[in-house]
Swiss-Prot record:
Organism of derivation: Cereibacter sphaeroides (strain ATCC 17029 / ATH 2.4.9)
Annotated gene: thiM
Gene3D superfamilies, sorted: 3.40.1190.20
List of residues binding ATP: R118, T164
Broad EC category: transferase
Name of the protein: Hydroxyethylthiazole kinase
Length: 262
């Protein structure tokens, strides 16, 4: 896939408003990542307004990291509002296979037709109803083990499915792309996976979801590579990563994106 820089340039010029229903651990990090990248975050989650706000935003992201009954109401209301308004929305099924509560929530959100599903291999396997070895929010399965399940999930749900890990895999059920951008320090900072979901939402707001998701993964991963050049550990990496998201140019993204057809 060519032209990732064009996707980034358009996202920054349009600065889409992205409604983020994320978890307690991730909220500040997700907002700062979106701001650094050039989007506009809104952390609107209560059911009293989440559905109405979803029609105002250009995209919605829903993260299952710390669900509670009231937050679940907000998630479902927002997903319905986004669908009614024709807005793209991204599902991040955090630890969806860990408990019966999460499995039920994942199934209900999946029925509300997300535009994109972004998760690690264990989460995608669980959401697709396959056997998984997930450990809470962490994956114990390699990306390659989830590729067939991702394709089936994309076909059955109509969503673009992104399985993220050392080498990411994106599919719409017919096509597939692998993205090799990223750095080993990225999983050592909490909420970066949640933040990636926000970036996917920002790109999906302005481009077709398959191409937008692949471009978002390349952008996020390449920023991680750039940040690692100056970081000495996870703490300095987090600061450098925000700076890299802000500084990465469309031209640099075109040069550095490592995408190939799968």
């Amino acid at each position: 896939m060519d032209g990732c820089g064009t996707y980034l340039d358009t996202m920054r010029r349009e600065a889409p408003l992205v409604q983020c229903i994320t978890n307690f651990v991730a909220m500040n990090v997700v907002a700062n990542v979106l701001l650094a990248a050039g989007a506009s975050p809104a952390m609107v989650h209560d059911a009293e307004e989440s559905g109405e706000f979803a029609a105002i935003a250009q995209a919605l992201t829903i993260n299952m990291g710390t669900p509670s009954p009231r937050w679940v109401e907000g998630m479902e209301a927002a997903a319905r509002g986004a669908a009614a308004a024709g807005r793209p929305w991204v599902l991040d099924p955090v630890a969806v296979g860990a408990t019966a509560f999460r499995r039920g929530l994942g199934a209900r959100l999946l029925a509300l037709k997300p535009t994109v599903i972004r998760g690690n291999a264990s989460e995608i396997l669980a959401l697709a109803g396959a056997e998984t070895r997930g450990k809470g929010a962490d994956s114990a399965d390699p990306v390659a083990a989830a590729e067939a399940a991702a394709q089936r999930l994309a076909e059955s749900s109509g969503a673009v499915v992104a399985v993220t890990g050392p080498v990411d895999f994106v599919t719409d059920g017919r096509r597939g792309i692998r993205c090799a951008n990223g750095h080993p320090l990225m999983p050592r900072v909490t909420a970066l996976g949640c933040s990636l979901t926000g970036i996917v939402g920002a790109f999906a707001a302005i481009r077709p979801p398959f191409e937008a998701t692949a471009a978002a993964l390349a952008f996020f991963g390449l920023a991680g590579e750039e940040a690692a050049k100056t970081a000495t550990g996870p703490g300095s990496f987090q600061v450098a990563f925000l700076d890299a998201l802000h500084a990465l140019s469309p031209e640099a993204l075109d040069r550095g994106a490592r995408l190939e057809a799968a």
